[in-house]
Amino acid sequence: EKINKHPLKDATFFQDTYAGTESVLYTVKAREGKTESSYQLPANAPLGYLNIPLNRPEDGTTPSGQNYFYAPNDASIGDVDGDGEYEIILKWDPSNAHDNSHDGYTGEVYVDCYKLSGKLLWRINLGRNIRAGAHYTQFMVFDFDGDGKAEVVMRTSDGTVDGKGKVLGNAKADYREPGVFDKKKNKLTRQGRILEGNEYLTVFSGLTGEALYTTDYIPARGNPKDWGDTRANRSDRFLACIAYLDGVRPSVVMCRGYYTRIVLAAFNWDGKKLNKHWVFDTNIPGNEKYAKQGNHNLRVGDIDGDGCDEIIYGSCTIDHNGKGLYSTGLGHGDAIQLTQIDPARKGLQVTNVMAVLIGMLPPEKSSCNSRVPGI
């Protein structure tokens, strides 16, 4: 049965409205003019995917005697050599990676760069002073200086080894907590956590993995108590993004905290130096209503039509100039999307899956239009 009047050249899918209970068989046939012919998939047909071999890091053992192994984790893409083809930047997490709420040593985190052929271009070892887990390492891959080759920007520390084998800072530094025995809980607490020590922000060459520029990390940890606890569960919640804050060039924005204090710092890379653009901090007078509004994720988009990107940081939005645009006051959420959800409504809208029951919202806050304080 012919189901469309015209070729599906402008469509990406067909939705069958048949609601019967009998099984349905779908067939796709090649047709030239009025003649139908069968379609055969040859035995040596190319795969619909690339099979890229990976170089798994060696297993390890923590100071407490726990063995661990590695599995591929988050990945990003970028053209690091300017040949017009993407490379894959892959993070390896150890099997003992931890959520921030959990104590324990972790193995070291590795970041690799692979050609689509499987050739390993470089490997960065973030070292013992960068804890492994979903919230700790947000690596940004982009051509920040417009030279046609992508760079990699991420948080580092003493002992990080770049793609050329050079150690950043003090190679002997070990900021991991040995642990404190809690008599009430009858167990060792804080072991493996990193509550002090140097943190850096490093720009790496996407082509070689070489550390091109390193500076003190902003937002800085400071005293973990300033973020709401003493075990770095809140202070070590990291996010990051890439945004066209001036509408022309890409900036990298490093973020810290979302349960209590929130700090965002925007930087521009000119090929030689990482220049601080602005810092937004909820501890600054006037920004208090933006505290406690962060998500486990964020979104970037031009929501007010000024040609510059804003940052949707959970239940609040930071304007392109580093000033607070609005805060809904709805608090922490788990998943957020920014798009034109309602085609009949002008502008972009935000949908946010909240982590707490907020009940029925008043009309002024039940709006999905992100141009105003709504969700």
Where in this protein do the model-derived segments appear?
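Repeat-based blade/solenoid architectures
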Residues: 55-74, 127-138, 220-239, 283-298, ...
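Beta-propeller blade termini
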Residues: 73-80, 137-145, 149-151, 239-245, ...
